[in-house]
Amino acid sequence: MKKFAAMMLALAMLFSFAACGGKTNAPTTAPTEATVKVEGTMEELLNKVVEINPVEFMGGTMPIDLTDTSEDGLWNIKYNTGLDNADNITEAAVFGPMMGSMAFSMVMVRTAEGADVKAVAEGMKTGIDPRKWICVEADEVMTAVSGDVVMLIMLDSASGLTAQSFVDAFNTVRGQ
């Protein structure tokens, strides 16, 4: 618990170093579908997407603990995925900047068997806070669906990156 709190405080401190700037939020959804179970862990898939569509910042991939149902654990799930709980997902991971205050977050979740994948994607898109970094805001928010995996990407387009390029890389990883 103390490690989690220290990590969250360190992340908040890192994100607070940049000046506050305002952007308008224009979320969109670009769903794709497949009927097969996606192979690989969420961390592996995130890393493959970044290999195809490299970023110019030091980023890292972290699994999201879905078993922690404490207040802090549920906050972490909501903060990263936009979902209120892990009822419809079995695995999740996030890729983001390790230092600095950048509006960038890419999350992948594996949906539970029988879960409505499109509903999970919509819940992520509508539940995520594009201003979660306080001083910066994502102006591009997209989700993509492939089989039992949902990817959520949000970023500030002023960074020179586009959410669509990450959706395209996700589709390449999936062979679509």
Regions from the PLM with identified roles:
Residues 21-24:
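Bacterial signal peptide processing site
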Residues 121-142:
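An anionic, turn-rich surface loop/hairpin at beta-sheet edges
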